[in-house]
């Protein structure tokens, strides 16, 4: 961690945490607890649940789903795929943080639903980002695009984990679509939203299968994405702006870096109910067009 004090009186606090140890919800729990201690408010501290046994692998491990896309095997385990060169740098990217108002998010939800049951802000907004990225990248209609995301399994396990479970309780999942189908005017936002709903509707059986897969598979180090794909991380609904170290409310909370092109974060905005900040990294020659499409399509939905 690093703390930087500015002459203007502002303070920047940076942290680095390993995803093998904790997920986003646990990371914000840690920061909230740290802030409570710093300002001397012990009453606000919620003790963490440190029991990891609910997420033990089964004996014997029973893998019921194909997790090979979401959890890549090492070159040795996935032969004959070529190994990634050690120390290889990720491709260059441009990044931006785009602001979506509560009214704009509501309009996207309505357009994605199209008269069907309610669509969540996450699914509507991610479908919008997915379509804009495919268009900005000028992908051909017959290309396959895959969108990776994560699901918090705390409430979906049987029995559910405690709310204060401290560890990594998210699993990776993904949705794929033919670009032509994703962008077809007749399909609209609802097509991608339905694909996302199917991908994120996983329950206890899927989570147990992931744990057993990780118990037996030799995993590869992280890397970039193909130019057709996206990886979306959502911090919406998390207590990301509740950390008061005694300096007052946060002015900004954001990822310090975006890793590689195709990475997207969704974040709630402090003090603005329903507003969402979208942090996105794309190939430099695609970013300007992505921004145009992002706001043009959103205006058309209003």
Language-model-detected regions and their locations in the chain:
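Soluble acyl-CoA-dependent acyltransferase catalytic core bearing the H(X)4D motif
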Residues: 1-229, 235-237
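Low-complexity, glycine/alanine/valine/leucine- and proline-rich hydrophobic stretches
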Residues: 225-302
């Amino acid at each position: 961690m690093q703390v930087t004090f500015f002459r203007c009186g502002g303070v920047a606090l940076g942290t680095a945490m390993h995803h093998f140890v904790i997920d986003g919800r646990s990371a914000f729990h840690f920061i909230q607890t740290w802030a409570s201690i710093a300002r001397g408010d012990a009453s606000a501290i919620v003790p963490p649940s440190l029991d990891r046994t609910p997420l033990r692998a089964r004996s014997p491990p029973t893998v019921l789903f194909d997790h090979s896309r979401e959890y890549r095997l090492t070159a040795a385990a996935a032969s004959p795929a070529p190994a990634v060169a050690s120390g290889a740098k990720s491709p260059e990217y441009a990044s931006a943080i785009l602001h979506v108002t509560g009214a704009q998010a509501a309009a996207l939800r309505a357009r994605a639903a199209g008269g069907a049951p309610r669509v969540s802000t996450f699914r509507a907004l991610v479908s919008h980002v997915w379509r804009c990225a495919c268009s900005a990248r000028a992908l051909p209609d017959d290309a396959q695009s895959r969108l990776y995301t994560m699901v918090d399994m705390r409430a979906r396990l049987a029995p559910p984990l405690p709310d204060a479970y401290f560890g990594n309780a998210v699993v990776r999942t993904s949705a794929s679509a033919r670009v032509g189908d994703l962008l077809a005017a007749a399909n609209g936002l609802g097509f991608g939203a339905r694909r996302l709903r199917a991908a994120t509707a996983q329950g206890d059986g899927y989570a147990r299968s992931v744990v057993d897969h990780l118990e037996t598979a030799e995993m590869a180090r992280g890397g970039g994405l193909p130019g057709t794909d996206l990886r979306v991380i959502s911090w919406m609904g998390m207590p990301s702006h509740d950390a008061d170290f005694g300096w007052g409310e946060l002015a900004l909370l954001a990822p310090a870096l975006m890793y590689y092109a195709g990475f997207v974060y969704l974040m709630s905005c402090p003090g603005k109910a329903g507003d969402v900040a979208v942090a996105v990294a794309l190939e430099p020659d695609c970013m300007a067009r992505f921004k145009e499409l992002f706001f043009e399509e959103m205006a058309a939905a209003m």
